[in-house]
From Swiss-Prot:
The lineage of its organism: Bacteria, Bacillati, Actinomycetota, Actinomycetes, Kitasatosporales. It is found in: Cytoplasm. Pfam families: Methyltransf_5. GO terms for biological process: rRNA base methylation. The keyword S-adenosyl-L-methionine applies. Keywords: Cytoplasm, Methyltransferase, rRNA processing, S-adenosyl-L-methionine, Transferase. GO terms for cellular component: cytoplasm. This is Ribosomal RNA small subunit methyltransferase H.
Length: 318
């Protein structure tokens, strides 16, 4: 995987969004999804007074980005952790509050480009999809062992796949003949089980199923449900958070957490809203910001990206 091909998504916009919080000496910024370190490298370069704490559950990503960030010495602390472990990580490092948090959700370029990880549907590979290959169950195990109703639920909930029942009927029929192990067989099965009209819309017909399996294998949405509120809680007043998501389920979750923080919690009808009911957050984006057409032309993986940001303006009510 050549690092030159790794283009961080909406990089300048993320830096601009976090910038007002990161100019003070000693500011701490957390990259919750280190990946190959593109965003982290830019943060350390643009904000020379800042310290970085970076998390990733993928040991190979930590190794590669560790080489990339080595020139920054002890300004960068890399941690093998899932991003909902952020409170524990900050606790261990003795960092009570941070000034910036960045999430770039979804699969890193490296995971997509390394065939044997099984994330990509465009090439044949073992059906693994674990971001941390030292733990958990693989996509093949989900396909081979989950009850049919559970796989239907996963494809509908996480892949928004309208043809889930058709696909799962085919999966169950095929797994009885021989367990699934490789992605090409699954891609072919999906293609064969979809009606013509469904194949004409929205890119590769396997895309939604692969997304759903990846989310299930890595527990992505449940992790995110814990991680975004934890990240907001870790922000000092004036601190900022930027989140890049890549499908509507993630984006909706981020939107809900930010909207709740930016709303007053006062009972209706109060003439003056007491401090404890005032919003904790200020939204930095109107809706979700999208990548420019120029960026999508340069980096097609940016196409589905949605960026939301918020700033902490008050402490939580006691």
């Amino acid at each position: 995987m050549s690092q030159s091909r790794h283009v961080p998504v909406m990089l300048q916009r993320c830096l601009d969004m976090l910038a007002p919080a990161l100019t003070e000496p000693g500011a701490v910024v957390v990259d919750c999804t280190l990946g190959l370190g593109g965003h982290s490298e830019a943060l350390l370069t643009q904000f020379p007074e800042a310290r970085l704490v970076a998390l990733d559950r993928d040991k190979e990503a930590l190794r590669l980005s560790g080489e990339r960030l080595a020139p920054f010495g002890d300004r960068a602390t890399l941690v093998h952790a899932v991003y909902d472990e952020l409170p524990d990580v900050l606790d261990r490092l003795g960092v009570p509050r941070v000034q910036g948090v960045l999430f770039d959700l979804g699969v890193s370029s490296m995971q997509l480009d390394e065939a044997d990880r099984g994330f990509a549907y465009a090439q044949d590979a073992p059906l693994d999809m674990r971001m941390d290959q030292t733990t958990g169950i693989s996509a093949a195990e989900v396909l081979n062992t989950y009850p049919p109703g559970e796989i239907v639920r996963i494809l509908r909930a996480y892949g928004e796949e309208k043809q889930a029942k058709r696909i799962v009927s085919a999966i169950v029929r095929e797994r009885e003949k021989e367990p699934f192990s490789n992605s090409a067989r699954l891609v072919e099965l999906i293609r064969d089980s979809l009606p013509q009209a469904a194949k004409r819309t929205g890119g590769n017909p396997a895309k939604r199923t692969f997304q759903a399996l990846r989310i299930e294998v890595n527990g992505e949405l449940s992790v995110l449900e814990r991680a975004i509120p934890a990240a907001v809680k870790a922000l000092a007043v004036g601190g900022r958070i930027a989140v890049l998501s890549y499908h509507s389920l993630e984006d909706r979750l981020v939107k809900q957490v930010f909207a709740a923080g930016a709303a007053t919690t006062a009972p209706p009808g109060l003439p003056v809203v007491p401090e404890r009911y005032q919003p904790r957050l200020k939204l930095l984006t109107r809706g979700a910001e999208l990548p420019t057409e120029e960026e999508i032309a340069e980096n097609r993986r940016a196409a589905p990206a949605r960026l939301r940001g918020a700033q902490r303006i008050r402490e939580d009510a006691e």
